């Protein structure tokens, strides 16, 4: 619910529908239980019945207000993410839900009129007012017809659930409950050690069977709200990537290629012709390479769909199985393999940033590793990029002044492999990662300070997949702790 409420208007609208529907459903179940009770155990009487009736009236107001609000957003609203995916099915679904609510009111109005408007029914203020307004000549017939229509519309609603977007009523909560808890949010899915594999038939995802069951459940859980697309920086800058379309297209391939084929949640413009369960019949490589892997889509999704995981898995297939990647990436891959950094700079220049410091920066090795509390992980940008080198110098200077004992790996430090992994080249990532892990484990490194957020995430959240378990702290965290310790003194 917290994610839903990030968009305040849409969040309030959904909350009204959700709370109203649950209230009315609970009220209906309670009424049926009451009817099944023997006379001595009936409980909807006196004050209890008045509170019950009044509560259901409030639930009805919330439910219908939310539904009419949702209908207005589609009819007269201008929000792009809503307008582009509004279909006839949406109007029919909302109309059905509104009819269920209104037929419930008319059923109640007929019953109250049939009982000749007793005073205690004034607490059912909507049904009471509607009954008086209609001035029914045959309240019994009106009540029966309204009740039958109400029941029929509810059964139509039940039938529509698996055939429409309404399925998310069930699939979304299940999907949220089944979201992986053990894997850190910043970590990519581990697919095994490729360097130790004897035979590799496939890496990444190309066909529906390559996706995990949880990734496929994501497809059915999608509410097509478009929040992911609205926060996607690639989409906002005119790139071809549309995170919502990625989910819908893979969902369509899954639905149409399954046995038997079932309707997809929502279709994209134009007829769907799928000749196989290959997702690249619907998704282009340009869409996938436009992704910056920022994870904004995952963070904003109200039902915990992991969109980035699917994009990265498809990238893995393109990069390693098809060699289908931008030329610029090919150069970076070669540089990372040959020079251990994306720019092809010499490893001998890893310590060049220390040359004009007024103190020595020690390099850790087998003979001195016990003298230092922290390994300072400089990173490729921190060592080679002209804009980042001043940051490296400043961090080292502050650590020295604070009395923190630290050392660096120097030429032994190689790229963490984050760029390779995020762009699909799992093989290069694992080569670099295992080299770093073996070096640090041999030096018995336990605590690491990083300044690059990419290095922080990779070492802290992804190196454990390959046997690298360290206490990793970002320089901003450590410096904050040091400042706070001085304040407390």
Regions from the PLM with identified roles:
Residues 1-69, 76, 210-219, 241-245, ...:
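Iron-sulfur-cluster electron-transfer modules
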Residues 487-489:
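Conserved small/polar residues in nucleotide/adenosyl-binding loops
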Residues 477-485:
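A general structural motif
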Residues 158-291, 339:
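Ferredoxin-type iron-sulfur electron-transfer modules and their immediate structural context
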Residues 152-153, 225-229, 291-295, 311:
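Short acidic (Asp/Glu) and glycine-rich catalytic loops that position anionic groups and cofactors
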Residues 1-205, 248, 253:
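Membrane-embedded alpha-helical bundles of multi-pass integral membrane proteins
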Residues 155-156, 232-235, 298-299, 318:
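Charged, low-complexity surface segments at secondary-structure and domain boundaries
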Residues 468-475:
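Short hydrophobic/aromatic-enriched beta-strand-loop microsegments
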């Amino acid at each position: 619910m917290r994610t839903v409420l990030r968009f305040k208007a849409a969040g309030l609208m959904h909350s009204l529908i959700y709370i109203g529907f649950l209230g009315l459903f609970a009220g209906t179940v309670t009424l049926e239980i009451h009817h099944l009770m023997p006379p001595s155990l009936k409980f909807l009487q006196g004050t209890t019945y008045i509170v019950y009736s009044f509560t259901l009236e409030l639930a009805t107001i919330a439910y219908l207000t939310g539904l009419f609000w949702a209908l207005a957003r589609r009819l007269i609203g201008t929000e792009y993410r809503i307008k582009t995916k509004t279909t006839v099915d949406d109007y029919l679904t909302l109309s059905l839900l509104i009819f269920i609510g209104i037929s419930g009111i008319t059923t109640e109005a007929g019953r109250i009129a049939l009982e000749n408007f007793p005073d205690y029914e004034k607490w059912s203020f909507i049904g009471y007012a509607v009954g008086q307004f209609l001035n029914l000549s045959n309240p019994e017939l009106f009540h029966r017809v309204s009740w039958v229509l109400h029941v029929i519309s509810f059964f139509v609603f039940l039938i529509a659930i698996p055939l429409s977007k309404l399925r998310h009523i069930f699939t979304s909560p299940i999907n949220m409950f089944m979201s992986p808890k053990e894997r850190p949010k910043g970590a990519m899915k581990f697919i095994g050690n490729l360097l130790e594999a004897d035979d590799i038939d496939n890496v990444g995802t190309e066909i529906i069977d390559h996706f995990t069951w949880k990734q496929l459940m994501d497809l059915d859980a999608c509410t097509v709200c478009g929040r992911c697309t609205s926060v996607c920086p690639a989409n906002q800058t005119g790139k071809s990537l549309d995170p919502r379309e990625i989910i819908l297209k893979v969902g369509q391939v899954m639905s149409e290629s399954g046995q038997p084929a079932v309707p997809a949640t929502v279709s994209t413009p134009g007829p769907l012709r799928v000749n196989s369960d290959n997702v690249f019949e619907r998704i282009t490589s340009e869409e996938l390479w436009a992704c910056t892997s920022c994870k904004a889509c995952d963070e904003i999704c109200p039902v915990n769909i992991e969109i980035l995981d699917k994009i990265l898995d498809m990238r893995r297939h393109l990069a390693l199985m098809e060699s289908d990647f931008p030329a610029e990436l090919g150069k970076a891959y070669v540089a990372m393999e040959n020079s251990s950094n994306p720019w092809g700079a010499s490893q001998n220049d890893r310590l060049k940033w220390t040359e004009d410091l007024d103190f020595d920066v020690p390099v850790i090795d087998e003979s001195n590793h016990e003298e230092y509390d922290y390994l300072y992980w400089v990173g490729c940008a921190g060592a080679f990029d002209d804009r980042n080198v001043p940051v490296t110098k400043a961090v080292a200077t502050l650590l020295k002044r604070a009395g923190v004992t630290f050392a660096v790996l120097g030429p032994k430090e190689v790229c963490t492999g984050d760029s390779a992994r995020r762009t699909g080249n799992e093989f290069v990532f694992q080569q670099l990662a295992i080299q770093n892990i073996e070096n640090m484990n041999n030096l018995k490194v336990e605590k690491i300070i990083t300044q690059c957020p990419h290095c922080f995430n990779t070492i802290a959240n992804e190196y454990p997949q390959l046997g690298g378990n360290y206490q990793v702290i970002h320089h901003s965290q450590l410096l904050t702790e040091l400042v706070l310790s001085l304040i407390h003194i």
